[in-house]
């Protein structure tokens, strides 16, 4: 192993020291937040730890994630006068996740140790900003037990790496640019390490009594997203989040469960040919959501992000058209955003023209013409708009909508895919 690591040395580590042990006790695959947590804690406990990652840097998706943690009974809750315990935390898991939809034994263990884990990160000097727990944004918890790192999840990466770095001269080592190709098993079928390819193409085997797979999800893998979740999907995940660990475990006969569960935002517009690049269109007051059959699907103004996501997930081909008229445009709106904090103000007409040129938007003088341009069933779409307009006039929207009832009476009309 010592020879194998020479070409994959972490530039932030003490290069001159080399790997401080001949054989690791623990091999950690993946240097994102889970891997850094595992490696740092194992090193604290005195184990020899080798952590590897296919990327050129550590942190994984935590380098770009918003950075929210959950913990029950934490020091920060006590400081804020908030009473909480693992039972209340577990009750939230059942309420929000649905009994039977998750491994309750693991969830119970998570609830029991979550507060201690958050306090440990606090002890490491993590910058939690104002240190005020909160309920959550989309589906509020029963107790304020969410915490955010200042500046996002990168705050956690910084403190975890700093803790792990303390042990680089004694019992921890990191190999980046190291692509694991599969797991190694003994004659009894137990995992005893991994096969890996270094940056220079060298193939090697990394052995350890314990192997911990911390390769994260698969949100950067379009093939797996298409297979398990969505026919059409965009992602902001880093390219390194490929879900390789699932394939390794499946090869060994491990059952994969709940792979069809994926929390996703709705309404992305591609900004390049890379499926990991998209943004949102924001400039309307009460636009309609129309599926590929030319039909509405929900009360657009009464839907929270969860309902909106469900609407997109259940739409044919996961495609929805945001349809609106010029009367629905918000003057001086921030037309486009790349996330919750990335809204930008653009001139509407040039931006819309750019979408039209890319085949992502259409403009027409009549509802029927718009349907023809988009490729929607003309009669169905026209009837949908007529029913919406009747609802605006009579106060009886087909989906119970009572807000932002702006009739689509006059063109031009627009559709954004």
Feature-to-residue mapping (PLM):
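N-terminal leader/propeptide and maturation segments of large enzyme subunits in energy/redox metabolism
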Residues: 98, 103-117, 125, 332-394
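A glycine-rich dinucleotide-binding beta-alpha-beta segment and adjacent secondary-structure elements
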Residues: 182-184, 190, 380-417
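N-terminal Rossmann-like FAD-binding beta1-loop-alpha1 element of flavoenzymes
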Residues: 24-51
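Glycine-rich loop(s) and the adjacent beta-strand/alpha-helix scaffold that form part
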Residues: 199-202, 206-272
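An anion/pyrophosphate-binding glycine-rich loop and adjacent beta-alpha core
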Residues: 246-248, 255-373
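Helical element adjacent to the flavin cofactor pocket in flavoenzyme catalytic cores
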Residues: 148-204, 209, 246, 252
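Extreme N-terminal leader/targeting segments of oxidoreductases
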Residues: 1-26, 44
